Amino acid sequence: FDRSLDGKDSRFLTKLYKRAFWPLSERNTLPKMEEGGLNVVLSTSYIPEIEWVDDQKLIKFLKWLYPSVNERVFNPTYFDATNAMMDRMEAEVEKYNESEPSKKFRFVKNIQELEECIVDHEIAMIHSVEGGHSLNGELAKKRVEESTALKPLVEGEILKNLEHFYDRGVAYLTLAHFYPNHLVSPVFPYPEYGIKSSNWKQLMAGWDMNKGLTSTGKKVVQAMKDM
């Protein structure tokens, strides 16, 4: 939602409720990280699931209010949108470094680059991804229940995309987020007040704590262990 990491050009939505919970508020900036003496920062990319957009009226309104965000975040595949988010983070860091701060930020892809970054007294940035749905490409673009016939092809695409994230330097991937995906069925992520204050129709309809990992999810976990 067009937050600026240098803290100089924040949009209206990011300034709301700075002292209370608001998922779009700006909580951190690169200057704050530098001032706080951080050595390593996890840069987590999260793309909202389509079911969440359908369930939450506020998000539907924001899609209409910010068409550029809709085009960038919700229209592409989860995989493409996640890569675009990481591209943008890297561009923001590069732009900030050009302003000649006292400490440079650098995205690192492996242990060797991390160690070099620390020796050089730079702040290491490491990519991470929240939600296994970010592995979904064109074949997996449809909702989980609609793509059963494509399962072998979807599984191959997911494993290929996982390897891409690894090569890009993603340090970890959470399997689940709010909704079931091709890897796993999650537990409900919110306390009771969250159920009352929001419409979780699609989540509650498909919520089953006994399902756990799918066969594809087990292969993804094994692949991550091997990596």
What is each residue range found by the language model?
Residues 223-227:
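Short, intrinsically disordered, charge-balanced linker/junction segments flanking boundaries
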